[in-house]
């Protein structure tokens, strides 16, 4: 791998996360002696410069679908950066997955293939999403059949390998873990799926459109860049991989009268545009009693993403929902959701009240 081909739409460069994505890749390329090629539309991609894969960055699902359609004839492997999607979910209280249905579907697949001795592999300790998966799995099987990553994934696999003979199937916590698990099995002489039937629980949008895929996570934009570059090396060595999803973990803040705490969760793209929060498993925020204190207000707005701040700026400037939607590249319903959320959080009911509140405390968005 001697190049890093990055496809990022021009309009995303107007946002801080878009600029920082390009900056981090530029720094990484310079540090490791790689050539960074930045494209803004799939139609202008140079196959020679891509060397078989392309990194795609964007939040607009319609644009992403367009990219997949355009790149499919080129047989390029897609590395999809979904880190920026977290900006839509920085200040909600929780995200709930339907992990029970996911596990049930996995078990139905195994049942159809007469696989009944199943292990759950690769769950990260202290990861909210993986903990939910573990609990649902334990309801169906035994805790002894769950192999979690406490120190390293190598130690986790070694623990599993000592008891591997008693299993005919494995459900992995995510697709990235599944690829690692598959490689280790091949190295140890096991055949997939003849000896072990393997299921990887992928989470992201592209996973349902292009298969097989890898999903992996990073903790900030710098580590996301490093993970992406490492994964790109894997794609060039394994042509059976069609796509890879690289995304960041979110810091989720719950504000309540009893205090505040942070947690980490993982997100499914189907929650990107919530029309009804209750239907999407999103819990509403409790309103702090000291909400109108200037320090609390400053903290609220400082924790907002660049997209959210742009929504509020345009709202204060009197722009219509459609104009705001066009400016920040999300649906009108998504804009309305963000507006209603900030109204509820600030205990106000109109655009005029928001303007009055900001003027009173001299807060500039």
Residue ranges of predicted features:
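Alpha-helical recognition/docking segments in bacterial nutrient-uptake
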Residues: 1-108, 164
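Flexible loop/turn connectors
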Residues: 92, 162-172, 176-177, 182-267
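An alpha-beta-alpha
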Residues: 104-144, 244-260
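Recognition helix of helix-turn-helix DNA-binding domains
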Residues: 318-353
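Short, basic, alpha-helical segments at the C-terminal edge of helix-turn-helix-like DNA-binding modules
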Residues: 348-364
């Amino acid at each position: 791998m001697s190049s890093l081909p990055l496809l990022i739409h021009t309009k995303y460069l107007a946002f801080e996360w878009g600029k920082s994505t390009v900056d981090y890749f530029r720094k990484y390329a310079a540090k490791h002696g790689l050539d960074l090629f930045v494209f803004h539309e799939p139609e202008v991609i140079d196959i020679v410069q891509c060397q078989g894969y392309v990194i795609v960055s964007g939040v607009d699902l319609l644009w992403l679908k367009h990219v997949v359609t355009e790149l499919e004839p080129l047989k390029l492997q897609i590395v999809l950066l979904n880190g920026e999607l977290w900006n839509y979910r920085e200040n909600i209280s929780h995200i709930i997955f339907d992990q029970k249905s996911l596990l049930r579907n996995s078990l139905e697949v195994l049942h159809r293939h007469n696989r009944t001795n199943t292990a759950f592999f690769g769950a990260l300790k202290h990861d909210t999403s993986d903990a939910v998966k573990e609990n649902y799995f334990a309801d169906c099987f035994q805790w002894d059949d769950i192999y979690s990553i406490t120190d390293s994934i190598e130690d986790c696999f070694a623990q599993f390998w000592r008891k591997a003979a008693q299993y005919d199937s494995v459900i992995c916590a995510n697709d990235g873990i599944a690829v690692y698990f598959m490689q280790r099995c091949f190295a140890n002489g096991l055949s997939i799926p003849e000896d072990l039937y393997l299921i990887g629980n992928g989470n992201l949008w592209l996973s349902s459109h292009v298969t097989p895929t890898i999903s992996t996570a990073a903790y900030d934009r710098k580590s996301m860049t490093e993970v992406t570059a490492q994964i790109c090396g894997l794609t060039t060595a394994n042509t059976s991989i069609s796509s890879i999803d690289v995304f960041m973990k979110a810091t989720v803040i719950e504000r309540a009268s009893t205090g505040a705490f942070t947690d980490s969760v993982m997100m499914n793209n189907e929650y990107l545009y919530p029309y009804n929060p209750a239907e999407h498993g999103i819990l509403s925020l409790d309103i702090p009693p000291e909400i109108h204190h200037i320090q609390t207000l400053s903290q609220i707005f400082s924790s907002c993403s660049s997209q959210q701040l742009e929504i509020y700026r345009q709202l204060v400037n009197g722009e219509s929902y459609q104009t705001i939607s066009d400016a920040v590249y999300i649906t009108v319903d998504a804009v309305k959701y963000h507006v209603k959320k900030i109204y509820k959080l600030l205990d106000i009911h109109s655009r005029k009240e928001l303007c009055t509140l900001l003027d009173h405390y001299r807060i500039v968005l």
